Amino acid sequence: MAHFSSEDEVMLQAMLRQLFQSVKEKITGAPSLECAEEILLRLEETDENFHNYEFVKYLRQHICNMLGSMIEEEMEKCTSDQNQGEDSGYDTVVQHVTKRTQESKEYKEMMHSLKNIMMVVVEAMINKFEEDETRSEDRQRKMQSGSCCTDNCSDSDSSFNQSYKFCQGKLRLILDQLDPGQPKEVRYEALQTLCSAPPSDVLSCENWTTLCEKLTTSLSDPDPMFTDRILKFYAQTFTLSPLHMTKEIYTSLAKYLEVYFLSRENHLPTLSTGVDITSPNVTRLLKKVRLLNEYQKEAPSFWIRHPEKYMEEIVESTLSLLSVKHEQSHLVPQKILDPIYFFALVDTKAVWFKKWMHAYYSRTAVLRLLEKKYKCLITTAVQQCVQYLELCEAMKADEILRHPKHCGTKQKSFYYSGQELQYIYFIHSLCLLGRLLIYTQGRKLFPIKLKNRKDSVSLTNLLVLFTQLIYYSPSCPKMTSIMCSENYSPASMVTDVLRMLCDQKECAVECLYNSTVTEALLLPIHNLTKGTAAAPDCSETALIHIADILARIASVEEGLILLLYGENMNSSEEESLTGAHIIAKFSKKLLEEDISIFSGSEMLPVVKGAFISVCRQIYGTCEGLQVLLPYGLHESIAKAWKKTSLLSERIPTPVEGSDSVSSVSQVSPNSVAWEDNLLDDLLNFAATPKGLLLLQRTGAINECVTFMLSQYAKKPQVNRQKKFGYEVLVVQVASTAAGAVALQNSGFISALITELWSNLECGRDDVRLTHPRATPVDPIDRSCQKSFLALVNLLSYPAVYELTANQELPNKAEYSLREVPTCIIDIMDRLIVLNSEAKIRSLLNYEQSHTFGLRLLSVVCCDLDALLLLEAQYQVSNMLLHAQEENTFEISENHRNFIIDGLSVERNHVLVRINLIGGPSERILPPRMLEKGDDPYPWPMFSSYPLPHCYQSEGPRSADLKQDNDIGNLLSCFKMSDKQTEWIENCRRQFCKTMKSKPDAVHGSALGELLEKFVLLLTENPSECYFPSVEYTATDANVKNESLSSVQQLGMKMTVRYGRFLNLLKDGAENELALVLKHCEKFLKQQQSPVTSSLLCLQGNYAGHDWFVSSLFMIMLGDKGKTFHFLQHFSRLLTSAFLWVPRLHNSRYLPVDTLGTGIHPIYFCSAHYIEMLLKAEVPLVFSAFHMSGFAPSQICLQWITQCFWNYLDWIEICHYIATCVVLGPDYQVYVCIAVLKHLQRDILQHTQTQDLQVFLKEEALHGFRVSNYFEYMENLEQNYRPVLLRDMRSIRVQNT
């Protein structure tokens, strides 16, 4: 189109005519020009013939010619990238190509050229249309002049109604009739005619400018009916005409008002006399202001479709009007009201400004004009806020507003005093400034210089002023309308503005998250805590508003850090408490009712709830809980809950006719609400592992879980302040034995399983399938996915043990189709262990339901303790083997083949998973899906042991490697130093050096010798010993006849199989390992104390297998003596508490209240810090966990408990153990952080596919090596070791 000829122009005109002719009915039926434009813009969606129009075909061909080759090149690039492994769908490719095309030079040139050409074509069509219209009007004028002599009668009341267009002659007549010299009736009739005409016709007339001037002049007419008619015409124009026409009306009205306010002739109200809105002059003025304001609020909805100059003219005329200010002088002693006062009367909350600032299109113009020409508008708004605060400080609350409309009055008043007008203007200014601060360019308008003040008002000054307004401003009477008081009370209005700022993160960081503002918020609270005089008029309502803002600050990471540590996180000044400490102290005093000025207040429970809510935002995080721990808030909240619960129980049952009925109806709902609030506060302690320990110590875990179920059933939308959804709370609670029992007793598990069964077995059969299922069937139907993940979250080993231990399967002879499972045992019986025809017949969707059960079994059995328990109780391996045996067909007399189907493939996978131990390179798990080709499943199936060798990797490492010089140097450390502290540090340095340079050397017999010597010498240093020495004299003969649990026996066999595979153990190792385990149980039993508890895990010996002892036995190459002697020495070190899980089972070294919870220090200490460090070091992964409704603590607890068996290769397990033994127990935390950092990409991917917990439990840690992350872990040690070791050392009972 570079050569655009006249023929091309004619052709395009014809195409456009065809298009407009086709859509003529749609356009002419539109009520306004904006609607017509919208119809054209959406034509492709609404017109089925859209692509048949010649103009559309022309555009498509033009785009193809100009951009076709470039689009094809981009498509080829994307296709090649996809073939190289980048997984991107069709939509992604389209988006990429579209973006690249729109950013290209060719596209911009094409659009520029096309716009220029279309402008020429459209301009020519408009000119031709105007010529046709002129000729048509001439003909019409001639016809009218001929017909007026022959027919003076008309059926209508106006000749206008008989014409299609409003003629010029008629407008000239109206202009003459509107002249001030004309009689009143003539002028009124002219206005009546004008209002009857379509505004677009009037505005398109050539005399429109003159008419506009006449109307503007006539607005000053004293006759109210006449001005009302003009305003009616203006209103019609605003409603029905396009922007470029209504802009004329708006600017003329704004200019009129500006002149009106500047004129000395008009008798404007003064501030001292106030405003009587029944006064005719004031009424007329307010009508004009209101009309202007109504259009202000409507204009932003459509002005983006018009040239920017129209919008700018409207904005500038408005700002010019609002900037009009009457200066006081000796000639005019009284303050005359400015236009802004009247705008505040009709739009108190400055809604017009909110709408103008919403879109970037208009916001840019507003802010530019405010900065360059009308900054005085912002200055006066700030000045008004400053003056109002000074007024509040100078006068008592009840003297500030004698008739506080903002607090609500029963009788409607039509008079506004000067003080009330000042207050209304203050509210308008407050809302305007609040909206201004949201935007970056708006904040750049500060600081503001005020008259009679030396210092400028900065952003921080303004925010401090806002917070002071909450405390100093008058509070509303308690009996007034709640709605009114909430809408217009000063404290509520300021709080609304601060809430708005909090919701904008960038704005909040710049404005609110600094020590000056938080100190201003906390100052009266701090004074109340210390017992000194608080700010004047610091009411309970003000405190509630402040708590609301503090809760919002604490809900954002930057705000939380500010409250926890202040702006200077490295400050060592202990006397200056941070915000979190002040809030915690104040909340504790409130709970203990230790603040005298609030005693007996009806609002006290609300104040308590508000500040506990702030604390909840803080202690709901790991780092926040650490700061608030010394205040014992869990105990104070629990005490308050028990007191409230006891009071509610004492309320008598209302009896009809008794005097107590009314009092009970009033007290009971408030009491129940306060009790629920306290339970919710307690429940939120479960958001972190250590918080869950504190919750269980209070004894309220059952009530909290029951409350959670009631809330979960309502399925509430979790608001922004609640950072943790109930799904994460369930995961944390289910990670402990007591929590699992509480979930069972509350009915949560029953409700979950009932919902699962409804989706699994009772799903709709008439659901339309849009595509056939994959082969084999989709493992878990979409409707059941949520229930599946909920069960995966629930079934940690502590939960599995409490819910299934010592319970047999029902194994009924017959199952009713109406019989719905209600517990985990029922799920095992009906979906997993299908060992009878009765169970199979009871399932309506047998294949889908059993597949679901097998998938669940696969995930649960990834926890080796859970696998051993299920194997010991239900022999799941034999059940699966038997099912495989039955799923065969005979092909010859002595040979049978397996039937390949979805269930047999799933069973084969589970059998390999639960029978082979090994890391990512030590075992091979068969896939769950069939392959394309002639052999869809090349993996061998089996129905008896041993497993086919193809599932084990070839060439396991030999037990003894040739000793390296580095490991030799490491062992020599134990002989060369006289000072114990020196050799310990020297040995650790050498170990780190070896792990970084030659990690494979730390393996085999050399590793066993290293650990043995290091621990022996370490225990010779009393300062390194954490637990006391225990005398143990039992011999093999003493323990030989002791029995091991079935779980321990199965675990022992599993260990020996793995050790033989690795060439670490020899024949007879099983008996040696059995003796080691028996000695360990006897040795640890000497250090246990009796525990009275209903929890199964606390009754008797440790419930799981001792994976640490098994690992040590393999490291020591099956040497029983070395293994047990090492463990005896090792048991004195702090590290043993975190590596050797059974070490602290029912241990007398733990506090009694900790012992009774059944929670291991690995969970409430190590896992707690894993979550805390993960949030700080790998925030994306931390966020991914919470988006998935899963907790890092649960999977890390599983990894640590089984010493990473099945997740890491043997050499990496050795490195993990050696690292923790040599460098300290805190390295357990650092290793887990390194693992999660290593998995970051996979974790983010599986968060999107919504199967994160399944991935983490089932998948080995591919590619992870401890040595690769050694420097990273050393950095973590430098940053966190003091805090971690201090907390780890605090787990033991403190000697007094």
UniProtKB/Swiss-Prot annotation:
GO terms for cellular component: cilium; cytoplasm. Required for high-level Shh responses in the developing neural tube. Together with CDK20, controls the structure of the primary cilium by coordinating assembly of the ciliary membrane and axoneme, allowing GLI2 to be properly activated in response to Shh signaling. This is Protein broad-minded. Disulfide bonds: none annotated. Residues 1158-1281 form the Rab-GAP TBC domain. Interacts with CDK20, which promotes CDK20 stability and function. Interacts with FAM149B1; may play a role in cilium assembly. Its main location: cytoplasm. Keywords: Cell projection, Cilium, Cytoplasm, Developmental protein. SUPFAM superfamilies: Ypt/Rab-GAP domain of gyp1p. The lineage of its organism: Eukaryota, Metazoa, Chordata, Craniata, Vertebrata. GO terms for biological process: axoneme assembly; camera-type eye development; cilium assembly; determination of left/right symmetry; embryonic digit morphogenesis; heart development; kidney development; lens development in camera-type eye. Disruption phenotype: Mice exhibit exencephaly, poorly developed eyes and preaxial polydactyly, due to defects in ventral patterning. It is found in: Cytoplasm; Cell projection, Cilium.
